[in-house]
Every structure is written in C-alpha cells, then in structure tokens.
C-alpha cells in the first residue's frame, strides 16, 4: 500500500544500507535545552533496555548517562550540521571517560551495539524523511535488535511529530505489534509517555496488535487506554475476551460480537459508546488486491500496484 501511494519503505535489517541514528535530535522553537531534555529521556530508556537487567538502571547511573548526553551534543549545538550529530559510539566513549566502575558496566553492555556484530544503529541517518508517507520495516531485524528497533523508530517518528508541529501539521503514526513495546517495563513506561506526548504535540498514534492478552496484561496499559478515544476490536479468543471484559468493562452481549465473528466485523469503542459493526471490504477493488494477505488467494500484488 505504501508503494502504491508513492511513499517510502525503509527496511531496517543488519545488512541494510538504510540507517537510523538513535542519537538524532530535532531542535524545537523552545530551544536546545528542551530538545535535549526529551532526547535524554529516550537515550536513558535505550540504555536501560540494553544494560538495565531485571531491576533496571539505578538513579545514579541514569544521572551519569544524562551528564554524558549533555556534553556529547555540544558540537552539534554549536554547528547543527548532519555530520556533527553524535553517534551511539560517542556516548560509549563518554561513559568510558567517566572512569566509574558502575558506568563502565553500562559502556561494556553497549560494546555489542557499537563495535560488535549488532552495530547497525551506530551510523548517521541516511534516510530521506521528506516523504509524506513512510514505512519502517523491521520484520527482518532479528530478535536481538527488534525491540531496540521499535523504540528507535518511535523516536524517529517523534522527531517528525516535533518538526510537523512547527508547521502546524498533524502526524499519523501506526505501530504494528505494539504489544512488544509494552512487554519490558523500560520500553512500556517510555511508550506511554511518548503516546501522551504525541497527542499533545499534534500526533495521532494508533497501536495495532493480534496479541491482545499480552497487550492488556502490561502494567502500563491504563496509560495507553486512558489516552485513546477509539478502540477497534475484531474476533477474539475466549481467554482474551475475559481480559477485555475486565479491562474495558464489556458485557457478555457485547463480547458476543467478537466471538467467532466474521472478518470485518466486531466492536468499536468510542469514548463511552460501544458500537457493533460489520464492514465487508469489497474484494473487487485495487486496494483489496494490494492489501490482501490470504495465501489461498494467489494475488500478484505487483500487478495490482
């Protein structure tokens, strides 16, 4: 669909030549300090995911990371050209230079992503983000980098939201497999915060998932649901229905509309209104041929496009 609409598909894989730099920062009208504060929040979350372990980073460790972050952007703030944008490697070097055993542990955790086989995100961004429709494809990124990739893409979208806000343009953001961002506490807390920030800054975020159970079991789910006006439910299994009834307050009658329901039918929750719906997508259309994923219907999507 993105190709048919002349959008840009960015494939993020270990062997890809398309790069996203997690250190990219979007300067706002509020000045460097405000932008850096938001960026620091993201990078600390990234480090927490990599080096935090079961209990997460301690506050003193986060404080040292924050201090290092403030220094490595000095060159870029003095002359904000692309080649002066810091890399993950600059953070790694700054942490080592701090000569603190606790921080050295964090730096050692970053080695794999800076000098090791998973250093895909240690490059300057070379993706042209000028297209109005962009798709970041992380399907082949691998388990080691997938969660990091989702977090980094989310931050790249935030940079676009921030940029578009200056131009008074709304930004629509669709995140598939959204439950993965809520699986780990570190990424879940940040994702809820970015969800709220998107809405406040003119973004229109939409999370999609087939793993409703995992999604609703997250400790941070209330922060997502409380900041979402619209919920779209299709057919659900019995186990997930019980969770939906508890989290969304659905009655047995309402749940019947997502029990063994046909494709294109289910429930819409809008504010405090619950609406059953049937939406049969016409199969004789170009968009159906492009978006159809049923293997039994051998459709040549290239011909459709």
Describe the predicted segments one by one.
Residues 10, 195, 247-249:
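Bulky hydrophobic/aromatic packing residues
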Residues 199-207, 227, 246-247:
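Long, positively charged, glycine-interspersed low-complexity recognition regions
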Residues 1-7, 14-16, 20-203, 216-219, ...:
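P-loop NTPase motor domains
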Residues 9-12, 204-208, 231-234:
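Short hydrophobic alpha-helical runs that function as membrane-insertion/retention elements
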